[in-house]
Regions:
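Short beta-strand scaffold segments in enzyme catalytic cores
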Residues: 23-31
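Short beta->alpha transition motifs characteristic of CBS
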Residues: 34-41
């Protein structure tokens, strides 16, 4: 398993251990993590801090050129909100742990020229499946249902 994806998975586990939704993400620039985060909606009472949004936030302000040369790793297929941020900042590549439990806006990313790689990671699939079964109300809230 790729070291960067491992860190994203570690962030997802951290969120779960905090009572949150197990989704993690890292933003990588020039082979270094510049931002890492996890879904903090439950922990912080936030309406927007999905894993990808938290990783972007924790990367702090960057010049546009940094985003245009970065890769974002996420344990779950990006929702429309996170997809919008990826497109807004021109991030050219997204590595997705799994899209079995939730298919985000991958088609839109591809349509806009973003390279999307799906790992079909069994650990991520099982972790999300278990979470959705155990806390369907939190999951539905997270995806706007």
């Amino acid at each position: 398993m790729d070291e960067f994806y491992k860190e994203a998975l570690g962030q997802a586990k951290k969120s779960l251990s905090e009572g949150g939704i197990p989704i993690g993400s890292v933003l990588v620039y020039q082979n270094k993590i510049i931002g890492k985060g996890h879904n903090r909606r439950v922990q912080d009472g936030s309406v927007i801090l999905h894993g990808e949004m938290d990783a972007l936030e924790r990367a702090n302000r960057q010049p546009a050129s940094v985003y245009k040369e970065s890769i974002i790793y996420t344990t779950l297929s990006p929702c429309p909100m996170c997809t919008g941020a990826i497109l807004l900042y021109g991030i050219p590549k997204v590595v997705v742990g799994e899209n079995t439990n939730f298919m985000g806006a991958e088609d839109l990313l591809r349509e806009k020229g973003v390279e999307v790689t799906v790992l079909h990671d069994p650990e991520s699939i099982q972790m999300m499946k278990d979470f959705i079964q155990e806390k369907p109300e939190l999951w539905n809230e997270d995806i706007g249902e």
